[in-house]
A protein has these predicted regions:
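Short Gly/charged-rich anion-binding patches and loops
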Residues: 61, 110, 241
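Noncatalytic, basic helical substrate-engagement surface that gates or grips nucleic-acid strands
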Residues: 1-103, 116-129, 215, 222, ...
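Long, highly charged, low-complexity intrinsically disordered interaction regions
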Residues: 78, 82, 89-173, 177, ...
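Accessory alpha-helical DNA-binding modules that contact the DNA backbone or grooves
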Residues: 148-227, 239-245, 249-253
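Amphipathic alpha-helical surface "interface" segments used
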Residues: 231-239
């Protein structure tokens, strides 16, 4: 199933977008900055009857097989999530005006912030079509303000432990207020002085907390370098073993 999905998307997009790259999750640097990042997922796994160690071992085995036997770059970097890898590779196409076309195959809306680059598009397997918004810059600002409950990141009106304490609930946030903050900095969220003036101290503190977790521009430089090194080290992989591997796996050609 995994191999057939890779084949399907490679066939669908390779002529226009070139080389397929597989981005893989590792432990996240974000947990070092915010202890509650994805904390509920760990709790859910502990309560689940599924043997998660065995499951992740299976996935890691597939990852290693593909990296060894197939010609696609498989990028797996310590402390980097797949989101980080995709973001860094997409951003690298902006250097020196290269602008090579990029297609992100994912239903994850976290990548919408990368749509600010005209050469970056996204295909959602869940929607079976393009994923897009009218204003990706505002979308990122709104996303930071609202947080991301699936990752354990509360909105910027709520405490750090909102999603890990029993009965914790977020303070409601109005869309009108988000628009006021956005307008206060004229759509330039890097204008720290404007944001500080528009928000109180706690709001701005929580905004910065969320920005670090959500904004893909905040990936540490050492991790960015490791991602690019891992990617570049896999250029020109040998295709000689691919056919034998596909036949062994009874892959549908």
């Amino acid at each position: 199933m995994i191999l057939n999905s890779i084949r399907r998307y490679n066939t669908k997009f390779r002529d226009e977008y070139g080389q397929l790259v597989i981005a893989c999750d590792s432990s996240s640097w974000r947990k070092e900055k915010f202890a509650n990042y994805k904390a509920k997922r760990k709790t859910s796994r502990e309560e689940s009857p599924l043997d998660w160690n065995k499951f992740f071992g299976f996935l890691n085995g597939i990852r290693d097989e593909i990296a060894e036997e197939m010609s696609f770059p498989v990028v797996h970097v310590d402390r980097a999530e797949a989101d980080d890898i995709i973001a860094v590779l997409a951003e690298s196409t902006q250097e020196f005006g290269q602008g090579e076309p990029v297609m992100i195959v994912s239903s994850d809306k976290d990548f919408i912030q990368l749509h600010r680059h005209s050469n970056v598009k996204q295909f959602s397997p869940m929607k079976r079509g393009a994923l897009k918004v009218d204003d990706p810059v505002f979308y990122k600002f709104e996303h930071i303000c609202k947080g991301d409950s699936s990752d354990g990141v509360p909105n910027m009106l709520s405490a750090d432990d909102t999603f890990v304490v029993e009965g914790g609930r977020q303070t409601p946030m109005r869309a009108k207020k988000i628009k006021e903050w956005y307008d206060a900095c004229n759509g330039n969220a890097s204008d720290v002085d404007a944001l500080r003036s528009a928000m109180n101290e706690e709001q701005y503190r929580n905004y910065c907390r969320n920005k670090l977790m959500i904004d893909l521009d905040c990936i540490p430089e050492d991790i960015q370098s490791n991602i690019m090194d891992k990617y570049k080290s896999q250029q020109g992989k040998n295709n000689a073993k691919v056919l034998k591997y596909l036949i062994t796996k009874k892959f549908s050609l």
